[in-house]
From Swiss-Prot:
Protein name, as recorded: Histone-lysine N-methyltransferase EHMT1
Region (Histone H3K9me binding): 905-907
Acidic residues bias locations: 344-360, 394-416
Biological process according to GO: chromatin organization; DNA methylation-dependent constitutive heterochromatin formation; epigenetic regulation of gene expression; facultative heterochromatin formation; negative regulation of DNA-templated transcription; negative regulation of transcription by RNA polymerase II; peptidyl-lysine dimethylation; peptidyl-lysine monomethylation
Site of covalent link Glycyl lysine isopeptide (Lys-Gly) (interchain with G-Cter in SUMO1): 22
Organism: Homo sapiens (Human)
PROSITE patterns xref list: ANK_REP_REGION, ANK_REPEAT, PRE_SET, SET
Gene field: EHMT1
Main location: nucleus
GO MF annotations in UniProt: C2H2 zinc finger domain binding; histone H3K27 methyltransferase activity; histone H3K9 methyltransferase activity; histone H3K9me2 methyltransferase activity; methyltransferase activity; p53 binding; protein-lysine N-methyltransferase activity; transcription corepressor binding
Related illness: Kleefstra syndrome 1: A form of Kleefstra syndrome, an autosomal dominant disease characterized by variable intellectual disability, psychomotor developmental delay, seizures, behavioral abnormalities, and facial dysmorphisms. KLEFS1 patients additionally manifest brachy(micro)cephaly, congenital heart defects, and urogenital defects.
Amino acid sequence: MAAADAEAVPARGEPQQDCCVKTELLGEETPMAADEGSAEKQAGEAHMAADGETNGSCENSDASSHANAAKHTQDSARVNPQDGTNTLTRIAENGVSERDSEAAKQNHVTADDFVQTSVIGSNGYILNKPALQAQPLRTTSTLASSLPGHAAKTLPGGAGKGRTPSAFPQTPAAPPATLGEGSADTEDRKLPAPGADVKVHRARKTMPKSVVGLHAASKDPREVREARDHKEPKEEINKNISDFGRQQLLPPFPSLHQSLPQNQCYMATTKSQTACLPFVLAAAVSRKKKRRMGTYSLVPKKKTKVLKQRTVIEMFKSITHSTVGSKGEKDLGASSLHVNGESLEMDSDEDDSEELEEDDGHGAEQAAAFPTEDSRTSKESMSEADRAQKMDGESEEEQESVDTGEEEEGGDESDLSSESSIKKKFLKRKGKTDSPWIKPARKRRRRSRKKPSGALGSESYKSSAGSAEQTAPGDSTGYMEVSLDSLDLRVKGILSSQAEGLANGPDVLETDGLQEVPLCSCRMETPKSREITTLANNQCMATESVDHELGRCTNSVVKYELMRPSNKAPLLVLCEDHRGRMVKHQCCPGCGYFCTAGNFMECQPESSISHRFHKDCASRVNNASYCPHCGEESSKAKEVTIAKADTTSTVTPVPGQEKGSALEGRADTTTGSAAGPPLSEDDKLQGAASHVPEGFDPTGPAGLGRPTPGLSQGPGKETLESALIALDSEKPKKLRFHPKQLYFSARQGELQKVLLMLVDGIDPNFKMEHQNKRSPLHAAAEAGHVDICHMLVQAGANIDTCSEDQRTPLMEAAENNHLEAVKYLIKAGALVDPKDAEGSTCLHLAAKKGHYEVVQYLLSNGQMDVNCQDDGGWTPMIWATEYKHVDLVKLLLSKGSDINIRDNEENICLHWAAFSGCVDIAEILLAAKCDLHAVNIHGDSPLHIAARENRYDCVVLFLSRDSDVTLKNKEGETPLQCASLNSQVWSALQMSKALQDSAPDRPSPVERIVSRDIARGYERIPIPCVNAVDSEPCPSNYKYVSQNCVTSPMNIDRNITHLQYCVCIDDCSSSNCMCGQLSMRCWYDKDGRLLPEFNMAEPPLIFECNHACSCWRNCRNRVVQNGLRARLQLYRTRDMGWGVRSLQDIPPGTFVCEYVGELISDSEADVREEDSYLFDLDNKDGEVYCIDARFYGNVSRFINHHCEPNLVPVRVFMAHQDLRFPRIAFFSTRLIEAGEQLGFDYGERFWDIKGKLFSCRCGSPKCRHSSAALAQRQASAAQEAQEDGLPDTSSAAAADPL
């Protein structure tokens, strides 16, 4: 660590010189207890072989030939306790006598090593001991009275001056023990015997004296892959259905028909049809669920069965068909859904519910509450007016009995049924004479009469098709939906929407929840229809889309059961080929055309299942699009191009295609709808768009707009609170919701329902088992409903509740770019630093998605760490780089993001920029001094990555910045070998290599990386080692440790009861902090840098908060204990051996690194041969100790001396307050630019010893220890000596410094 690391030439003929100790003069210091900070890491034994570089001493192996120097007068009274007479046998601390056999030494050194004699130190190494007989007494040395002690590095401070009163606070700390207690060092010190030799002096670094220019000169105001999209748990289908089935099917009203497929008559097949009808909007939730298409299990805890084909005889052998009927009856019959040939009847709902309830253990209640068939029949005969009158005027007892039956019937189960339950109920009713073709509308009306509470506010209406009176499916889940008008509350006006578009009006209440995601019916069959069969004429009715052209299939038909992809498409008779393709979900549910060849969207909920559909045919609900087959978000689907099969086509193009009738492209169950000529895809899309039901908004139902974020747009906090109080006092008696409904209502923004449910006592923290245990607050935050978030928080929702994947509501809002929701949650007290199951914070999620404003707000909040890393080691900057968010990269860079942080595979941002191929980001990173030559764990440089990924622009950029085209990775591949042969990238690399090979004058050796991290991962930031000067390998004659270690007992006071601590509840920035008072004040600003008024010339002691304090670990008064944070590099200098430089701009006052090594006593330092790495821990109240970084140390052991240093050592106490063992922390004194070498002042006493061996080569114009300055001082000293008449003694020290 030499100041000059230059070769030293000892003076010829001069006696062997002692290395002197440098100590600091300390004034009075307040007593306090002590410790060392962190668990000392005992490193392994280091090699003793000399590497020719000593960073502060001579680089030759004869460094032991220094002339002995006497100690300073302050230390002259001290005698080494180990020194006896010259003839005595010396015994090392480990008990090995120097007269022992050579076997005690043979395992440690060789004859040409630093060690010249055989003293074994406490660290297990053989220490060099010159022959004692040749050691002159220090009292006889001509320099005895003028030289200080050891030539150790010292701390800054005025020599010979006591510390000023302001240097250390005189606080009545009242420690339990006086300074130095717990150690008998002082008592054990022996008085020198008469005639005894004085102890040997060693060179030690010390704190420098006050030097002009030490003060800070200027103030410079200076964050792979995607976490592999969360592997969603593959849930069983029965869990999906039992979850989704609990949602309500809202009451019918006149406009409902316009928002559902026409001509469906809402077939009396609610249970089975729901497998293809809309599931609730829960399908759009971000916690995606994997569905196994076609094998829906609609009954919880029951195994699903695959639908199997049945013959016509099997289907109808026990069913009496009505041969005579009206055309309308036939249409309705054709519309009735059959699963495996079995018709479904509405009067099976009660049986379904009974079975479902039995599964959940409610069978006993069900049996008592169910109405009989006779009662249902009698109710069926009631008129509409009678039903309305009954709903209003029915006695309370009768109403309660019906309500109880229906509520228990619905419970929290779905009104969906599975194939197995259908078969059971079919067998129960096998002997009944009911015709399966009975009008479903009549049975639906019957249910509405006997269950008024199942669909409050429902109204009957006429179908626009005009055939049968229809009603929407009632809510069989038992959730009460009550309009405010019916509640007769005083706060009705308050609860009404005060913001336009807010979904909380009385009319909107009836439309809430209608926006369900339609699912396909590709695996459903309907019994054959005579009209459609006649129309088909024994030919397949499939229409194929081939490269935007439509054609008809001409294959013959074998089976006449009808199929269609969705309710929007007509029923078709298909050939065996198209039947198979229908089952494989290759028919688009939006238009009914088979996706044969061309560009289509393909959704893959599972690896073995794929769904094809047209991009424009995706289901759209609330401005979001979903797969029309399974309801997954269409953003998960990918666009695929399917080549046209090279086989004899069975599809004949239809010439002269004309725009079809109004029925084409819409849901049509009439028998003649399939007879019209097919349309081109453009015409088809136009037709589909033109036939959207009147008044139907594909982005959401009329009046159901997403509420504008921000409480200012809706009811205020006071209004909501008063409404809750009023509702609580006037709670409706007949209101009952299931807790799961709160989740769906919160997600859909249904303010009134959420309010009513909270009033009803539903737990706002109820977690959905089948939604990854997410709470209603998760759902509201994900959708950006700030008003509902506020309502839930006011009702007691845990704002930091975690889902199964450890996501918080704030993460959901940040990931989905809901800035107002993010602001509200943070202001409401949400934590910003929790991590999900993959270690991502909300900042990671927002950066990955490119949400600029959200990232900006999170960083401006002041609580986010811009360089936080997830479980993969990726920072927000890495995510923004991979996803090519250029503006976000600039923002993060301006906020202090570290572009050289490495992930778990040691990639830096430039690797990811090369991977993504974004040359703009690559240029930004290179302009910010990103390391172009950095290699990852596989040895790949950014050029390797760019070549492998065929990123031509990035390759050209890297080559223009002198990237090494010959560098080999661990597989032995150069970037040229990584590129595809004869590609554009390959050609560019080949040309660059040819130019380098043909260069006549080869430049100096290219900088090569000799170690990617000298710390071996022990530091948070890797420290690479490079060499562009010679062939010297990375230094290996020491053991890298990140914390101070000991090799012999030090008796450091680590008693926690001896610590003085603070009880702060803030960030310890106030004057009340006890730790700050010990330091006079807290010297750190909010960025962890020293304040401008900090005394760099004579730094005071700094007491950081410790583990006994009551403050948080991230308080302001904790900086050094956070470890190394600056990007440093060990490199080979041309004339000073190894040095350390910064790879980034370091603002003034920034903690850079700590001087780490082996803690040894002053007496042991005297017997150590190599004294270039000693740092004196001056202490005037007891035994003096040193840090020796010769055998154990960190990167600071390579920092060279500089006469105008950019670093200053400061004594810091953290985990202990033992004043004998401060930790030495280096802080920047000024702005350190990237690439600048680091240096600190070793101290005058170091150069008093080492100046005779070599000179300083720092190159500063104010250098005080250069050969010229040394010669000038020697000449002046000689002249003064002659004038005083004294003999000239300077000849002994006038040797050539080189």
